[in-house]
């Protein structure tokens, strides 16, 4: 049985009012060598895609000056002087997302507007999310471009990723191989490595939060979004949260956890990328069965679904899904593995037939537009994540079934020279997906 509890947010300092400095815009370079590049068991965005409104055009007559929104709030002139604000393209429980174009560059972004009246008493949760977004700057992470805080609203100019999500990329392609899956993991592991170098744990890595960025040369890369559950790791964490299919055993066991819960989630995603269904599956809506499987950590590669998948891929998945946290791979080790750095990929590439199984198992369907997934991720806030925070009512044998007690998480030294101001593009030893 599960009961809902509130996220243990860490109150931070008040948001700057306003912040006039602008973070560097995402690099428009299109590297030809980039790697491909509610609480249901599988989860999804808290914002319903079916209700997302998509704007195909903007009013060309819009000029600088304070604008009144259809939702009844005034968009500050500080925003409208720099951005042409368009129609509402997403409407979540606590935030509205509007199309916006930077006037000086014609670059398209998304303006996320959080109405403070809906957040009373829980402001610290929003502050924690924004404080994380301020710190992160990486090619494989959805960026916060600029922010402005006024008494009644918080305005966030966000990078708008328009290529759909990870499942969209797989189900819409005509050819899909291990090399494609390897490239996707390269992008994800690069983002995780960077976050962990800052001692930030994401805690909700799943396909719906991995968005496809399409470069001008036709290559693609993944960007990780939705930092509503992200937090700084300065000691063991105990809040039981996440999306059940991707949650690590140490979270369920409530023994304390750290950064490597993100590696477990990435391992589950890698498994899905290669066969179309997750390694741990419950029966119907019985999450206890799913959690018991996760606690046991027995990973199988059933025939015929895995017959044409390389042993190198299976070995890597096993190392990412180790119940023993000390033995589980880090993001650095994932990136160094032959299957990811190209040495372990098979020469004869078999096409993987996973799209149909993904559609069936995850009940994925067509979205209103390719932008819908990116808008949905932006529309989600930390407050929406309260549904994904749960406490397991321990049975007497929970810890007994959890065979490997994790060591207290250490402050990680998986550093990479990506400062928050870096706009370097992650390059891969492989072809793009």
From Swiss-Prot:
Residues 83-340 form the Protein kinase domain. One of its GO terms (molecular function) is protein kinase activity. It comes from the Eukaryota. It is an enzyme of class 2 (transferase). The modification Phosphoserine is found at residues 23, 25, 27, 30, 40, 45-46, 48, 57, 69, 419, 428, 431. Residues 1-74, 388-433 are annotated as: Disordered. PANTHER family: SERINE/THREONINE-PROTEIN KINASE. The modification Phosphotyrosine is found at residue 213. The keyword Phosphoprotein applies. Belongs to the protein kinase superfamily. CAMK Ser/Thr protein kinase family. CaMK subfamily. This is Serine/threonine-protein kinase DCLK1. It comes from Rattus norvegicus. The gene is Dclk1. Residues 40-57 have a biased composition (Low complexity). Probable kinase that may be involved in a calcium-signaling pathway controlling neuronal migration in the developing brain. May also participate in functions of the mature nervous system.
């Amino acid at each position: 049985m599960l009961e809902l509890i509130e996220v243990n947010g860490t109150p931070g300092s008040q948001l700057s009012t306003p912040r006039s400095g602008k973070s560097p815009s995402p690099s428009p370079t299109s590297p030809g060598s980039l790697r491909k590049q509610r609480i249901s068991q599988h989860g999804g965005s808290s914002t319903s895609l079916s209700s997302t409104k998509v704007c195909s055009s903007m009013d060309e007559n819009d000029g600088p000056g304070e604008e009144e929104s259809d939702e009844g709030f005034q968009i500050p002139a500080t925003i409208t002087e720099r951005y042409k604000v368009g129609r509402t393209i997403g409407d979540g429980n606590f935030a509205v997302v509007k199309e916006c174009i930077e006037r000086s560059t014609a670059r398209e972004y998304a303006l996320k507007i959080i109405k403070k009246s809906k957040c009373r008493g829980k402001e610290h949760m929003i502050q924690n999310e924004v404080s994380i977004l301020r710190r992160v700057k990486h090619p494989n992470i959805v960026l916060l471009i600029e922010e402005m805080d006024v008494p009644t609203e918080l305005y966030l100019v966000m990078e708008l990723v328009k290529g759909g999500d990870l499942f969209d990329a797989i189900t819409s392609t005509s050819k899909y191989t291990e090399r494609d899956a390897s490239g996707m993991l390269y992008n994800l592991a690069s983002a995780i490595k960077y976050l962990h170098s800052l001692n930030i744990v994401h805690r909700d890595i799943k396909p719906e939060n991995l968005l496809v960025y399409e470069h001008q040369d036709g290559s693609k890369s993944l960007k990780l979004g939705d930092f509503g559950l992200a937090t700084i790791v300065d000691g063991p964490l105990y809040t039981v949260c996440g999306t059940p299919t991707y949650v690590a055993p140490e979270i369920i066991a409530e023994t304390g956890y750290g950064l490597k819960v993100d590696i477990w989630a990435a391992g589950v995603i890698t498994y899905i990328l290669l066969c179309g269904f997750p390694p741990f599956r419950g029966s119907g809506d019985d999450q206890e069965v799913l959690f018991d499987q996760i606690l046991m950590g027995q990973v199988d590669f059933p025939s015929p679904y895995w017959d044409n998948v390389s042993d190198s891929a299976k070995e890597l998945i096993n190392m990412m899904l180790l119940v023993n946290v000390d033995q589980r791979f880090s993001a650095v080790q994932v990136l160094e593995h032959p299957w990811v750095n190209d040495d372990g990929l098979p020469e004869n590439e078999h096409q993987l037939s996973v799209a149909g199984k993904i559609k069936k198992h995850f009940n994925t369907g067509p979205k209103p537009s390719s932008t819908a997934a990116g808008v949905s991720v932006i529309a989600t806030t930390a407050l929406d994540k309260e549904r994904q925070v749960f406490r397991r009512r321990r049975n007497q044998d929970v810890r007994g079934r959890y065979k490997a007690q994790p060591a207290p998480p250490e402050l990680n030294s998986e550093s990479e020279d990506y400062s928050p101001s870096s706009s370097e593009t992650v390059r891969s030893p492989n072809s793009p997906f």
